[in-house]
Amino acid sequence: MTLELVVLDLAGTTLHDPDAVGVAFRGAMAAVGVTPPPEQVTAVMGLPKPEAVKLLLSQAGRDPSADEVQAVHADFVARMKQYYATSPEVREIPGATHLIAQLRQAGIRVAFNTGFSRDITDLVLTRLNWHPPTGCDAVLCSDEVARGRPYPDMIFELMRRLGIRDPKKVAKVGDTAADLGEGSAAGCGWVIGVTTCTHTAEQLRPHPHTHLADSLAEVQRLLLG
């Protein structure tokens, strides 16, 4: 099967994340009196962030209104924007730009998709010089489709934009169960879990995938040989 498109996640897959997303989640939740355990925060990584907020509030025994979810999410977004605009820790995971370049040199399209909203995503792309068309071929955020992960909507929309017809010619690469669920739901030919950040191989192994990789160099070997 010929590979035509690789869809990469951002935080934890190609974007270094020293628990910055988790810190922002916990801070926004603490502001409304909720202290989720770390494993609950890890479990919602990869989901659209408003859905993650609603789930964490529900797990804390709340019956959150739409307004409460929106307020907590707005606090999370503000914390993330501050971090990605100013932190010296914002950098790629080793090998990310090289992987993108090698894939594109081989004639393979490269797109990012993410559970972040567009305002956060654009800050990341600016810091790392990954804006299309020079840094990649396309970017899609979970607030730009009807359903985020683990539904396949973002992958299908990226395929539509880039003229890719067969999901078996698409690879999805991510570091969360939601990423793997998304790739599997889309019918991607490659569904690769990266075990360098939020989840270990043991945590990802029960979820549908074709491969697990402990580095982006291994991802490159899997995709390009």
Where are the regions that the model predicts?
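Active-site neighborhood of HAD-like aspartate-dependent phosphohydrolases
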Residues: 1-43
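Alpha-helical substrate-recognition element adjacent to the catalytic core
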Residues: 23, 31-61, 66
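Substrate-recognition/cap helix-loop segment adjacent to the acidic, metal-dependent catalytic center
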Residues: 30-32, 56-62, 97, 101-111, ...
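A short, structured active-site edge motif that brings together acidic residues
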Residues: 40-45, 68-70, 74, 132-147
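Metal-dependent phosphoesterase signature
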Residues: 58-98, 106
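Structural recognition of alpha->loop->beta junctions
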Residues: 128-142, 203-221
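Conserved Lys-Pro-Asp/Glu-containing loop-to-beta segment of HAD-superfamily phosphomonoesterases
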Residues: 149-180
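Acidic, Mg2+-coordinating phosphoryl-transfer loop and its flanking beta/alpha structural elements
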Residues: 171-211
